């Protein structure tokens, strides 16, 4: 491998809620390995324990239950380690440098191309081709595209996510306001936030962190008809007039103090502020349901609804993404790792993932059960699937995302206007994209 993963991952990571011999293979193809597995069918796997890494503690209990089913069926044990998102990729970098990546782990579109292009992930192409369980047509095509590189597949889709608006019913009742509906526009949200804000700063109408692109302003940009990244990943759309118009809605919230300061939000996540009664509304991804359904405050006060529409276009878009189950290229347990990945992507496991309320599943037709898993209007998330666009990504996603967050933060602090920030974001993104295509 010409470049170490360390060098490729030296830039900072998005911290909220986004080595050498690891690429060396055994010289055995997946097809040959599958044949060897068939020969060894029936052998005792009880001595194998697969290391599994994820970043969400809320999903851990449900995944442990599903993996316990896997162990009963195969004899292969698993051990889940949770590393929070803020530290996950740093930990993976260190593991990659030491040649000790977990056997199986979550992969994200922000990092997938770098891992795939540097040979860090086990090639699953032939495993998938020969599987009776994993059929590509049963999952969204765009999710497969996140984890494919040069005609090869390196992960099996784990889930799919959409975005919805959460609101505090008690705060709306106290303000004498009707609850948000699917007919709302972003202007309706702004007007409600003005009425929900308290002058003493004890309560804000809305909350959106500077780095909350996926669950926040990406959706607004697409609603208005702007774009973040063009189809061939060569140009940023932040300087498009429609993108700027959409981002100026956020600027209004900032200028009118309808949302907490950047400093306050740097110390507290949006869900913490919402669940502590400090903000009346937030936008959140479907991956957060596990946290809400075990939170007494949310259970007593919260519900969700579809995102607002754009008043000009009438469009209501949800950015969507999906994680992938991947394996280390140098795992000592390739066959067992594949068996776990295959099981976790199966209709059976995907349906149980939805039924347990872990998250929406990638396997088509299984997420309806997820909507019944908690006493909230989770149908809103399924309805958001009517108009979805995949989360923008390129080989250097993390570098331009983090750089853009720094500029958006300067709008929060009054150092830049939103138009200035958008034009600067476009310029620096275009530089990063040009570097990608020059390699």
Region roles according to the model:
Residues 94-95, 100-103, 133-171, 204-205, ...:
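A structural signal for short loop-to-beta-strand junctions that line the ligand-binding cleft
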Residues 46-57, 76-81, 103-104, 154, ...:
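Short, well-ordered beta-strand elements
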